């Protein structure tokens, strides 16, 4: 397991992490506790400085005691810890999202704010292979395409997030802690099937593992293949878009589409000269990348395929709606994308 962590830190499975500061998201569970210990043991070898951040979401009566346990643990290691207490129910109401999403957003906002140098330092989370399997299945349920179906990134440079344990099984983390005589906390809400993630964990994954005891190994292989493909397509689409003619903020024959305070994005044109001769697979990935740059919201495969079919057939004036108030219009062989808030990657 130390080899896995060191491989990440040396850049074998992501951008190298040396001579920097890492802020560890410490819930007190087995995964984040093991992560903090491993990085603590490797800190001198890798030139790391460490701090931790614990969030009390205020949703359970045990949470205050868990925060105190995190303080005691970090004090014993000599690692600075920041504890934040939130009222997630109130945040969920203000943001008009579920409590799980509100807690996640608040956590990552606090972690990002804790980075001493956002351009050089890292947020480290304890996501493990079981979490990756849940993420893959939830993406499948939501209709994600390839290669996003492969699951969350191990290394997310744009958001400065590193998940060093992502390819490690949870039982190995628990065995590691047990060998050291280190205890951890169990969140009682993890036993509830209220959330989709827990239903995957308790119901679906055990069935798949019963059918194939190597299911988690297959998830690991799928992740690796997906991220090889993702790296290829990100490089390919970026090169294609950078070579395309500059996108106008106003398209002749259409209503003006300059920067809009409500949407935050100008029109982006994919000209016919760029699209002609490309394989359908590359066109679809260009569409997805343009939509991603224009803001949040998953592009449904059905709509992407319909847009591509309209372009191939030359059906000018055809308009397609995408999540996040974004549109795509076929006009004179070009495709004009409009609207949408500024882009932000998802975890």
UniProtKB/Swiss-Prot annotation:
Keywords: ATP-binding, Cytoplasm, Ligase, Nucleotide-binding, tRNA processing. It holds the Pfam family ATP_bind_3. GO terms for molecular function: ATP binding; tRNA(Ile)-lysidine synthase activity. The keyword Methyltransferase does not apply. It catalyses: cytidine(34) in tRNA(Ile2) + L-lysine + ATP = lysidine(34) in tRNA(Ile2) + AMP + diphosphate + H(+). It is an enzyme of class 6 (ligase). ATP binds at residues 27-32. Signal peptide: none annotated. It is found in: Cytoplasm. Residues 243-263 are annotated as: Disordered. It comes from the Bacteria. GO terms for cellular component: cytoplasm. Ligates lysine onto the cytidine present at position 34 of the AUA codon-specific tRNA(Ile) that contains the anticodon CAU, in an ATP-dependent manner. Cytidine is converted to lysidine, thus changing the amino acid specificity of the tRNA from methionine to isoleucine. NCBIfam families: lysidine_TilS_N. The N-terminal region contains the highly conserved SGGXDS motif, predicted to be a P-loop motif involved in ATP binding. Belongs to the tRNA(Ile)-lysidine synthase family. This is tRNA(Ile)-lysidine synthase. It comes from Nitratidesulfovibrio vulgaris (strain ATCC 29579 / DSM 644 / CCUG 34227 / NCIMB 8303 / VKM B-1760 / Hildenborough) (Desulfovibrio vulgaris).
């Amino acid at each position: 397991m130390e080899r896995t962590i060191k491989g990440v830190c040396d850049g074998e499975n992501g951008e190298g992490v040396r001579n920097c500061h890492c802020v560890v998201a410490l819930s007190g569970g087995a995964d984040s506790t093991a992560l903090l210990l491993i990085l603590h043991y490797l800190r001198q070898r890798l030139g790391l400085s460490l701090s931790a951040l614990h969030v009390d979401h205020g949703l359970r009566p045990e949470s205050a005691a868990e925060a105190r346990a995190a303080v005691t643990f970090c004090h014993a290691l000599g690692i600075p810890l920041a504890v934040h207490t939130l009222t997630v129910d109130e945040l969920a109401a203000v943001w008009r999202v579920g409590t799980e999403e509100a807690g996640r957003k608040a956590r990552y906002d606090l972690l990002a704010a804790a980075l001493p140098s956002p351009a050089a330092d890292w947020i480290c989370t304890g996501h493990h292979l079981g979490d990756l399997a849940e993420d893959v299945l939830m993406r499948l349920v939501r209709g994600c395409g390839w290669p996003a179906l492969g699951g969350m990134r191990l290394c997310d440079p744009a958001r400065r997030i590193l998940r060093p344990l992502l390819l490690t099984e949870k039982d190995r983390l628990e065995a590691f802690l047990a060998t050291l005589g280190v205890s951890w906390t169990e969140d009682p809400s993890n036993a509830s099937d209220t959330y989709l993630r827990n239903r995957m964990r308790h119901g679906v994954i055990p069935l798949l593992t019963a059918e194939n005891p190597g299911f988690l190994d297959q998830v690991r292989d799928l992740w690796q293949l997906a991220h090889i493909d993702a790296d290829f397509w990100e490089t390919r689409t970026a090169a294609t878009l950078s070579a395309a003619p500059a996108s106008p903020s106003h398209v002749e024959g259409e209503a003006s589409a300059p920067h809009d305070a409500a949407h935050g994005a100008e029109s982006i044109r994919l000209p016919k000269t760029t699209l002609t001769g490309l394989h359908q697979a590359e066109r679809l990935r260009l569409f997805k990348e343009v939509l991603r740059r224009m803001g949040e919201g998953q592009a449904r495969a059905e709509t992407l395929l319909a847009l591509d079919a309209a372009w191939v057939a030359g059906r000018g004036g055809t308009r397609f709606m995408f999540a996040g108030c974004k549109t795509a219009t076929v006009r004179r062989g070009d495709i004009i994308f409009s609207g949408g808030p500024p882009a932000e990657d998802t975890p």
